[in-house]
UniProtKB/Swiss-Prot annotation:
Its EC number is 4.98.1.1. The keyword Heme does not apply. This is Ferrochelatase. Its main location: cytoplasm. Keywords: Cytoplasm, Heme biosynthesis, Iron, Lyase, Metal-binding, Porphyrin biosynthesis. It comes from the Bacteria. PANTHER family: FERROCHELATASE, FERROCHELATASE, MITOCHONDRIAL.
Length: 367
């Protein structure tokens, strides 16, 4: 074959260094939970570094990069870095960032569940932005003998700006590997019965401990999903429809109607129109309309983070109270609740079918 027929980029391609392949090596299966990411510390420098990576993703901000990078580097990072660091510091746990802490707990909780059901798999997690990166963890899994990897995003509803970009990062890492593992992806589980059950259980258990809203007296449950620009809906992103689907199934599981329950979208960034109604203005309007109690739950967030603890628990609460509301409740996210861990195991097991993950005898503890 003549090199003239080989694409120029292929001639200059460089692959990551890898150890020699051995036929006798362990052929293991891995489940990789993928979440968004978090700064390494609640400091302006760490937050700016994280935001620079996050907001430089063209799937997150769909503006020509040459223009956007000037805006990002000269205006947004200098201003938002310090302000965001203060917010992170307010929610930081002794063990670290809430998102990382709860994600690690999910991993440690699902491992024994797999083992108890006869699965011998490696379970780990990675972050799309920050550490541990998807590329680094995939490399670690390969060194541990993983030849098959299930990518399980912690985003129940698919969106280009979350699920797709996580897959982009994974495939980019694979593109640098000479010896690639087999990979499967979980696109979404917005309507999965186990996920809906876990959501309903989380709400029920919170109400059992803190009292159920007096819906007959006008109290409300607000289901707040992370927002995205409205134009993404017009361009074919299924996120909005899947959020509505999740909300409808959860309301049905709780026996609620659209009178008792509202669906909203939070975390708007910039001046463009995002999916509506917006969470904070809705809570302010409810308070002004005489709603005494409002409970807010975030079904699209599988682990508590800045957007749920600080934005909902502080900023949105203040909007409701200033509007005239009396009692505000933020229902914690799924985190490592037993029902959610069981759901994670079920969703993963369905997508592991056909791979050699079961053992005939009592399994060893998973790595």
């Amino acid at each position: 074959m003549s090199f003239d027929s080989v694409p120029r980029h292929a001639l200059s391609m460089r692959f990551d260094l890898e150890p020699p392949s051995h036929a006798s090596a362990a052929h293991r299966v891995a489940v990789l939970l993928v979440n968004l990411g978090t700064p390494d510390a609640p400091t302006p420098r760490a937050v700016r570094r994280y935001l620079a990576q996050f907001l430089s993703d063209p799937r997150v901000v769909e503006i020509p990069q040459l223009v956007w990078q000037v805006i990002l580097r000269t205006l947004i990072l200098p201003l938002r870095g310090r302000a965001s660091a203060k917010k992170y510091a307010a929610v930081w746990l002794p063990e670290g960032s809430p998102l990382r802490v709860y994600t690690e707990r999910q991993v440690e909780s699902v491992k024994p569940l797999f083992a108890a059901n006869g699965y011998r798999v490696i379970v780990d997690y990675a972050m799309r932005y920050g550490t541990p990166s998807i590329a680094d963890v995939l490399a670690q899994l390969k060194r541990a003998g993983a030849e098959r990897v299930l990518l399980l995003p912690m985003y129940p509803q698919y969106s280009s700006s979350t699920t797709a970009t996580a897959f982009d990062a994974a495939f980019a890492a694979l593109g640098r590997m000479r010896n690639q593992p087999e990979v499967r992806t979980v696109r979404h589980y917005a309507d999965h019965p186990a996920y809906i059950h876990a959501l309903a259980e989380q709400v029920r258990q919170y109400w059992a401990a803190h009292g159920r809203p007096a819906f007959d007296a006008g109290d409300k449950l607000v289901l707040s999903f992370h927002g995205v620009p409205k134009r993404t809906l017009d361009l074919g992103d299924p996120y909005h429809d899947q959020c509505q689907q999740t909300a409808a199934l959860l309301m049905s599981a709780l026996g609620l109607t659209t009178f008792e329950c509202r669906v909203t979208f939070q975390s708007r960034f910039g001046k463009a129109e995002w999916l509506q109604p917006y969470t904070a203005p809705t809570l302010k309007e409810l308070g002004a309309a005489g709603v005494r109690r409002a409970d807010v739950f975030c079904p699209g967030f599988t682990a508590d983070c800045l957007e749920t603890i600080e934005e909902i628990g502080i900023e949105v609460r203040d909007e409701f109270v200033h509007g005239g509301g009396k009692e505000f409740h933020r229902i914690p996210c799924l985190n490592a609740s037993p029902a959610w861990i069981a759901a994670l195991g079920e969703i993963a097991a369905e997508n592991l079918q056909g791979w050699p993950v079961r053992v005939a005898m009592a399994p060893e503890a998973v790595s």
